[in-house]
């Protein structure tokens, strides 16, 4: 039970927020914006990684951008590999979904 409480506390705490932000920033900085990209892009991306952060899968599941934008986002995830390691092992998830909203 203590293990579950630790995982729950870590996943809802500031370390989790910091880790999510580092993942999102790494991917957004790897993004090569296609000519068809417009302001207000909002996409959900499913990422699969292995321990060590190597990306083995990336798929845009929902997006208000066209096919070119979707493909560019998936490519950015692969370019961002390896992803940053979490500050606590409890934060590692083989598959996670994040919201891609570049400014």
Predicted regions: what is each one?
Residues 1-71, 75-79, 86-95, 100-103:
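Compositionally biased, low-complexity segments enriched in charged/polar and small residues
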